[in-house]
């Protein structure tokens, strides 16, 4: 009888210990579940941050692409201007040569033609920064060439008339006055070209400033992309580490659940054994 009582007490203590261990396991399981939930929440936050970083990266990349497109367009525009300017410089050079030859035929108009040539020289230096007004300038240059041809015709006519009698001197003087008027008009057109060249120069300076600003923005975009790339790598590393931690905790949870199940089964076995013992005692 004493042995049975001792066995019952031992089984009761073992049952209580099993209950305590089961409660401890349940508490540990709850703690692990809470830690797991926190890590999952942090993992979700990291995923959101990763998504935001990806969006920032895409935005910066789009800005960089747009800046590169604008820069390429500016470079193409400058190249076209340089090409147009080279053609205009050649035409101006030819115009100067024609003006020099006309000086020999029309001595009285030499000074004004030289002034027009000097003005053309000045415009030649300024045309290196000429913008998209080449068509309008071509029309004005054509006008100058037409006036030059007309001046040549007047000069040749004057030479023939100088060989004639004095009675044609008055007619020659009238023709010369007309030539002077045309030369004055040519000077006015050259002055007009100088003004336009000045405006074009200012426009080219503005384009140069815009190109510099575009280059600065490109450097800024590149720096932003490098920063975002680094932040993206850091976020990926943290996400990977969080995944590994969650995996470990999940394994720990599974192990604790298995232990808890084993303890419950052991507790059930002890309870069954106690019930059987009580039944035997009742039989006595």
UniProtKB/Swiss-Prot annotation:
<comment type="subunit">
    <text>Homodimer.</text>
</comment>
<protein>
    <recommendedName>
        <fullName>Tropomyosin-1</fullName>
    </recommendedName>
</protein>
<keyword id="KW-0677">Repeat</keyword>
<feature type="coiled-coil region">
    <location>
        <begin position="1"/>
        <end position="284"/>
    </location>
</feature>
<feature type="region of interest" description="Disordered">
    <location>
        <begin position="103"/>
        <end position="131"/>
    </location>
</feature>
<dbReference type="InterPro" id="IPR000533">
    <property type="entry name" value="Tropomyosin"/>
</dbReference>
<comment type="similarity">
    <text>Belongs to the tropomyosin family.</text>
</comment>
<keyword id="KW-0175">Coiled coil</keyword>
<dbReference type="Pfam" id="PF00261">
    <property type="entry name" value="Tropomyosin"/>
</dbReference>
<comment type="function">
    <text>Tropomyosin, in association with the troponin complex, plays a central role in the calcium dependent regulation of muscle contraction.</text>
</comment>
